[in-house]
């Protein structure tokens, strides 16, 4: 039976790289995948899953209005659904992916952040934590050498930012992956 997977981590842990590798593994064996990323993530251009290591792939985009049930429907020959930036999924979209896994035997593997820069769950991540059949924490390290579990937003002077909108797209110039201690110390 297929499952809904949630593979989460702080930023810079290799989530997009892992997604691209999984897609390659399926396709190398002749299986079709559908890959989606959040429309609002434009760090590397819209509609791309991009690894900081270099590989990039054009993919389909989703936003809050995307209906995965209608989009994927009963499309034959799909072996797996892969979602990058899964923290931006809505509760309903996660429910749809869960239904596809259990009622259509179509696995969905979602990659994303668990929490925002204030340590709060994203709505999509909260629903994935509730419904995912299998969860895997991907690891990266803090500057101090400990395991990084938090995403710290920083200003132009590399100082911790504590206020602002939950979603602000940015890469290494705006965010640092840090351990809990460094997150609290700022």
Describe the residue ranges of each PLM region.
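Conserved ATPase-coupling elements of RecA-like P-loop NTPase cores
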Residues: 86-97, 117-122
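Short recognition patches in nucleic-acid-associated and regulatory proteins
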Residues: 141-168
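Sensor-1/coupling segment of RecA-like P-loop NTPase cores
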Residues: 101-123
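Conserved P-loop
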Residues: 1-72, 116-127, 137-140, 161-162, ...
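Conserved RecA-like ASCE ATPase "motif II neighborhood" in helicase/translocase motors
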Residues: 60-82, 91-94
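Residue-level preference for the first positions of well-ordered beta-strands
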Residues: 4-6, 32-34, 79-82, 107-109
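Walker B catalytic acidic pair
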Residues: 84-86, 112-113
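Short basic (Lys/Arg) and small-residue
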Residues: 132
């Amino acid at each position: 039976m297929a499952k809904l997977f949630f593979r989460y981590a702080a930023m810079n842990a290799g989530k997009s790289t892992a997604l691209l590798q999984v897609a390659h593994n399926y396709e190398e064996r002749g299986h079709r995948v559908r890959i989606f990323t959040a429309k609002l993530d434009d760090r590397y251009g819209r509609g791309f899953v991009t690894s900081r290591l270099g590989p990039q792939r054009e993919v389909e985009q989703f936003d809050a209005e995307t209906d995965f049930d209608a989009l994927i429907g009963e499309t034959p020959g799909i072996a797996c659904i892969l979602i990058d930036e899964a923290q931006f999924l809505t509760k309903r979209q996660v429910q749809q992916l869960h239904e596809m896994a259990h009622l259509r035997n179509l696995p969905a593997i979602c990659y994303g952040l668990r929490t925002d820069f204030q340590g709060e769950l994203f709505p999509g991540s909260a629903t994935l934590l509730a419904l995912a059949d299998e969860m895997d924490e991907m690891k990266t390290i803090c500057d101090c050498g400990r395991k990084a579990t938090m995403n710290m937003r920083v200003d132009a002077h590399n100082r911790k930012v504590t206020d602002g909108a939950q979603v602000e797209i940015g890469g290494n110039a705006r965010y640092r992956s840090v351990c809990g201690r460094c997150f609290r110390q700022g």
